[in-house]
From Swiss-Prot:
Species the sequence originates in: Vibrio vulnificus (strain YJ016)
Alphabetic keyword roster: ATP-binding, Coenzyme A biosynthesis, Cytoplasm, Kinase, Nucleotide-binding, Transferase
Protein name according to UniProt: Pantothenate kinase
Record-listed E.C. numbers: 2.7.1.33
GO biological process: coenzyme A biosynthetic process
Keyword Transferase in record: yes
Enzyme class, UniProt record, top EC level: transferase
Stored InterPro entries: P-loop_NTPase, PanK, PRK/URK
Reaction catalysis annotation: (R)-pantothenate + ATP = (R)-4'-phosphopantothenate + ADP + H(+)
Family of the protein in this entry: Belongs to the prokaryotic pantothenate kinase family.
Organism superkingdom: Bacteria
Protein localization: Cytoplasm
A GO term for molecular function: ATP binding
């Protein structure tokens, strides 16, 4: 017997329960990823019901906190509700995170929603080169997990004005910029590794993981060969866009013909991203409380909710 309840898209959409759509077409256009066509229908049928579910969880947490504060006779700032979003490279988890961030921030009871990606906790390019693991970027050993866990722990502890490193997909490195996170009501953490636990880090044993701090977790899923296809399509779009920008780490790929670019993207998938998905990301799927399963057209076709 499966630990998940399965919903078709049509059945799931009925759980919206008349919640109004607070995003415009322009909002959605700004939120979608380079390789996705996020429609209003997708937002209404999939993400509105999900935002309603998450809002109910947040309300329950806030009610519990108010009881505790009343009992203790204090008015300390309540810890944030932390949502983790995991999935493969190119599966669309960043778009999911941005849409949920926008929707949740419009609910009356928790207007302050922050989104942080784990990319900012990758080791700098120089350190990855020194350790000889540049080709393992995105694998467990390429992250400063102690720093990431400390950040999430500090957020949960209610510490103000926390700083998060900012990662650039143009320079392929950590920048000097920082993002400030100041006691949000809801924190969304998006990344390849947010559902990983001790068994995924045998090389660097520590007792606490991001997954230990999550109040709700989402895994964005699709068939591996479908994600590979999306990765190749995204690579081709980057070749004509982001890779052409000044300072781009991948500027040399702009000189490739389209066929050469396709073959290069397939090689990168085969040697790096596909292996990381199979070995380190996919095994964490069953730990999620909700799975969004996508079809070939990037649209969510099935929703699995843990009982």
């Amino acid at each position: 017997m499966s630990p998940f309840l399965s919903f078709s898209r049509a059945t799931w959409s009925e759980l919206r329960n008349s919640v109004p759509m607070t995003l415009s077409e322009e909002d959605l256009k700004a939120l979608q990823g380079i390789n996705e066509n996020l429609t209003m229908q997708e937002a209404v049928e999939v993400y509105l019901p999900l935002s309603r579910l998450l809002n109910l969880y947040v309300q329950a947490r806030q009610s519990r906190n108010s009881v505790l504060h009343q009992f203790l006779n204090n008015d300390e700032h309540a810890p944030p509700f932390v949502i983790g979003i995991a999935g493969s490279v190119a599966v669309g988890k960043s778009t999911t995170a941005r849409v949920l961030c926008a929707l949740l921030s419009r609910w009356e009871n928790h207007p302050k929603v922050e989104l942080v990606t784990t990319d900012g906790f990758l080791y700098p390019k120089k350190m990855l080169n020194q350790r000889g693991i540049m080709h393992k970027k995105g694998f467990p050993e390429s992250y400063d997990m102690k720093k990431l866990v400390q950040f999430v722990s500090d957020v949960k502890a209610g510490k103000p004005e926390l700083e998060v490193p900012v990662y650039s997909h143009i320079t392929y490195d950590i920048t000097e910029e920082v993002k400030r996170v100041d006691r949000p009501d809801v924190l969304i953490i998006e990344g390849l590794n947010v559902l990983q636990s001790g068994m995924d880090y045998p090389h660097d044993p520590h007792r606490v993981f991001v997954s230990d701090f999550l109040d709700f977790s989402i895994y964005v899923d699709a068939e591996s060969n479908t994600i590979e296809q999306w990765y190749v399509e995204r690579f081709l779009k980057f070749r004509k866009g982001a890779f052409t920008q000044p300072g781009s780490y991948f500027s040399h790929y702009t000189q490739l013909s389209e066929q050469q670019a396709i073959e290069k993207a397939q090689q990168i998938w085969r040697d790096i991203n596909g292996i990381n998905l199979t070995e380190n990301i996919l095994p964490t799927k069953e730990r999620a409380q909700l799975i969004l399963r996508k079809g070939q057209n990037h649209l969510v076709e099935e929703i699995l909710l843990r009982k």
